[in-house]
Swiss-Prot record:
Binding site for ATP: 10-18
Source lineage: Bacteria, Bacillati, Actinomycetota, Actinomycetes, Mycobacteriales
Catalytic activity annotation: CMP + ATP = CDP + ADP; dCMP + ATP = dCDP + ADP
Gene that encodes the chain: cmk
Name assigned to this protein: Cytidylate kinase
Similarity section: Belongs to the cytidylate kinase family. Type 1 subfamily.
Entry-linked SUPFAM superfamilies: P-loop containing nucleoside triphosphate hydrolases
Keyword flag ATP-binding: yes
Enzyme class: transferase
UniProt keyword annotation of Lipid biosynthesis present: no
Subcellular localization(s) per the UniProt record: Cytoplasm
Family annotation (InterPro entries): Cytidylate_kin, Cytidylate_kinase_dom, P-loop_NTPase
GO MF terms held by the record: ATP binding; CMP kinase activity; dCMP kinase activity
A Gene Ontology biological process term: nucleobase-containing small molecule interconversion
Length: 223
């Protein structure tokens, strides 16, 4: 099988993570969640007591942060923080930290190192096809209505035991959309050569099967 790089972008709540994992499994490829890397950086900032809006202080510390991704487990300075990076505190701060130029420079460099020249890989995030891997042969942009994404996130929160409110989650989804699409560095937008997939009315298995078809069409490879 020919090695293939698949870049998957889209806003929060479109099913990027679960679909990307499933696609990687079907392809026999590695999976890289770049959003988790921004969450690790955000956690490091919060632990250091730095204001998430203090670009100067964060810029000075960003190169000292040591992080590792291994089979969907995430390590910060050798500590497994896979659960902690998904807390509400990190979620509230991650867009602000991600918008800081020094953070993006550092993490884009790490992401390219992790993705390139190491076999087939599915990389998911918000600027993979436009900034991190602009030459990726397969680019996919997942989308869904804000209401659908808020409902999914709310259901996840309730299922995990953290009571939530749909209206609050919807407001947070819209807030993050605005921050992600208007930030000065690497804003979220659809790459010109990306294939757009609306997941609003699709089950996870349907999305994965559809993406497999798109990968085959775009790459010409056979699995």
């Amino acid at each position: 099988m020919t090695d293939i790089v698949v870049a998957i972008d889209g806003p929060a709540g479109t099913g990027k993570s679960s679909v990307s994992r499933g696609l990687a499994r079907e392809l026999g490829a590695r999976y890289l969640d770049t959003g988790a890397m921004y969450r690790m950086m955000t956690l490091a900032v919060l632990r250091a007591g730095i204001d998430p809006a203090d670009a100067a202080a964060i810029g000075e510390s960003v190169w000292k942060v040591q992080m590792l991704s291994d089979h969907d487990r995430y390590f910060l300075g050798g500590e497994d923080v896979s659960s902690e990076i998904r807390t509400e505190e990190v979620t509230q701060a991650v867009s602000a930290v991600s918008a800081i130029p020094a953070v993006r420079v550092r993490l884009v460099d790490l992401q390219r190192q992790m993705a390139e020249g190491r076999g087939s890989v599915v990389v998911e995030g918000r600027d993979i096809g436009t900034v991190v891997l602009p030459d990726a042969p397969v680019k996919i942009f997942l989308t869904a209505s804000p209401e659908t994404r808020a409902r999914r996130r709310n259901d996840q929160n309730v299922a995990s035991g953290s009571a939530d409110d749909y209206d609050r989650v919807l407001a947070e989804v819209r807030r993050r959309d605005h921050l992600d699409s208007t930030r000065a560095v690497s804003p979220l937008y659809v790459a010109q050569d990306a294939m757009i997939v609306d997941t609003s009315k699709m089950a996870e298995a349907e999305v994965i099967a559809h993406l497999m078809d798109l990968v085959k069409q775009r790459s010409g490879a056979v699995w």
